[in-house]
């Protein structure tokens, strides 16, 4: 058991166990005292509890989070919420020329099977559960790659902070979060190294923006950079969406 003081030397001491975190901003040894500032005290204790013997089992976690999605396209699990509850996306869905106007998450299997929509609303409600962060991390930590919201989007600043916590607790998983919710974007320095948040362009063939470091867009032309349509709809060995060195990913219109 060790102790961490903030970098000013005047802050509270926080007890911690031996930590090995590659992507969360915490490191082992002496350097931990300053880098621990990337997590508040609650986050540190969350990490400790998560890695102790009493960590949540998958079966218990799924009772809180509800089910995840495993598609043949993706290299790992994904997670969906109801597209009807998108804050910005629902407004854009009324506007021709936006990706949300013909949103794939409001047609096909998403609407064909009532059980899918019901599960999405259960997941939406689950975000309020006090153990949601721990439960999500318990399931996701076994994944090399994870996609947030193959349907739906971030609901609030509090929801975004919870997502950041999940990413910090799963440093060996690469996370990809596409979003239209500009008002919920965190400060860039708060984003863990293992998370890529891609701000979605609001118009098809829309212009690039300097509002955020990573973007995604939709095209009806030849500017597509996502190879999935040429690979029977699969990612195969492509990981552009999860790669922080790739600033922009352009998809073909669904």
Can you say where each PLM-predicted feature lies in the sequence?
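Cationic, low-complexity basic patches in intrinsically disordered or flexible, solvent-exposed regions
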Residues: 18, 39
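Class I S-adenosyl-L-methionine
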Residues: 50-254
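Basic polycationic patches enriched in arginine
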Residues: 3-5, 30, 49-52
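Short, low-complexity, intrinsically disordered N-terminal modules
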Residues: 12, 17, 30-33, 48
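Short, positively charged and aromatic/hydrophobic N-terminal segments
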Residues: 40-41, 46-48
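Intrinsic disorder/low-complexity segments
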Residues: 20, 26-29
